[in-house]
Curated annotation (Swiss-Prot):
This is Protein FAM131B. Residues 323-332 have a biased composition (Acidic residues). The modification Phosphothreonine is found at residue 316. Residues 1-22, 95-114, 221-332 are annotated as: Disordered. Belongs to the FAM131 family. It comes from Mus musculus (Mouse). Residues 101-111, 272-281, 288-302 have a biased composition (Basic and acidic residues).
Length: 332
């Protein structure tokens, strides 16, 4: 086979040997009709997956560019036109009473929109988009502000609950500590402060816990005074306080109606007989009983005792004070 004839691509006969299998050659590139891979430019005949992937990628890039130029842009313009029509017609607004010839108004609006230039259409489209963004942002800000208010309310309620629980716990602990305190010492302190007036001498016995008044109750209602105890009239001048045991102190002011029988023992020890037998008014007896309780309490300075007695006497009502004044005038 002549080399010149092979360069010009003119072959007169087909050789039978496999070495001269390619019949045509053009610009140094061998072409074979039997090998289809030879049509790929600048690729080997035995092309691998990399070459196929590169071809697919380039093909996809070209196809996507073509789609963008011929399909995407017109579709986007069409969607923009729909958005323009939505904003133009005000479909998102509340429904209003439509006139009889509403289709004519729609047609006029459509014609007016069609008469707009591309710049005006784009401007209207951007205005509509910005309006929607503004509405969405305002809505999100409103929701976030509501969430913030809820969080602030919860945060303010939580410390209040904590403070309430702490105060309640402190109150319970103080009550427990007061209940566990020695019971034989509290009447003296409370009576010295002018807060309590006990009913009978049984309250001073620490052995019987059921008869001891609790500070939380605010008052003491002891058992009824025993009738077997000698009264004021039965006891003579020679028996000042012989009817009572040595361990048991004289009876104190109580809640019974027989005031003279309860205060008699204490008064006999402190004053003459004729002064004790003089009938006392209930108000005077109450003041005398409180003074006796103050004498039983631990002694303090005279000024403090005077202030405490004044505090106890101030508990009486205005009517009682007026009654005392009238009785003093009558005695004078």
């Amino acid at each position: 086979m002549d080399s010149t004839s092979s360069l010009h691509g003119s072959s007169l006969h087909r050789p039978s040997t496999e070495q001269t299998r390619t019949d045509f050659s053009w610009d140094g590139i061998n072409l074979s009709m039997e090998d289809t891979t030879s049509i790929l430019p600048k690729l080997k005949r035995n092309s691998n997956a990399y070459g196929i992937g590169a071809l697919a990628k380039s093909s996809f890039s070209g196809i996507s560019r073509s789609m963008k130029d011929h399909v995407t842009k017109p579709t986007a313009m069409g969607q923009g036109r729909v958005a323009h029509m939505i904003e133009w017609q005000g479909w998102g607004k509340a429904p209003t009473i439509q006139p009889q010839h509403s289709h004519e108004a729609v047609r006029r609006d459509t014609d007016a929109y069609s008469d707009l230039s591309d710049g005006e259409k784009e401007a209207r489209f951007l205005a509509g988009v910005m309006e929607q963004f503004a509405i969405s942002e305002a809505t999100l800000m409103a929701w976030s502000s509501m969430d913030g208010e809820d969080m602030s309310v919860n945060s303010t309620q939580e410390p209040l609950d904590c403070n309430y629980s702490d105060n309640y716990q402190e109150l319970m602990e103080s009550q427990d500590a007061l209940a566990q305190a020695p019971m034989d010492g509290w009447p003296h302190s409370y009576v010295s402060q002018g807060m309590y007036c006990l009913g009978s001498s049984d309250a001073w016995e620490a052995s019987d816990q059921s008869l001891i008044a609790s500070p939380a109750t605010g008052s003491y209602l002891g058992p009824a005074f025993d009738d077997s105890q000698p009264s004021l009239h039965d006891m003579g001048p020679s028996q000042p306080a012989s009817g009572y045991s040595a361990q048991e102190p004289p009876p104190l002011l109580g809640v019974d109606t027989d005031w003279a029988s309860e205060v008699g023992g204490v008064e006999l020890a402190r004053g003459p007989v004729e002064e004790e037998k003089r009938p006392l008014a209930p108000e005077e007896e109450e003041d005398a009983g409180c003074r006796d309780l103050e004498s039983l309490s631990p002694r303090e300075d005279p000024e403090m005792s005077t202030a405490l007695s004044r505090k106890v006497s101030d508990v009486t009502s205005s009517g009682v004070q007026s009654f005392d004044e009238e009785e003093g005038d009558a005695n004078n």
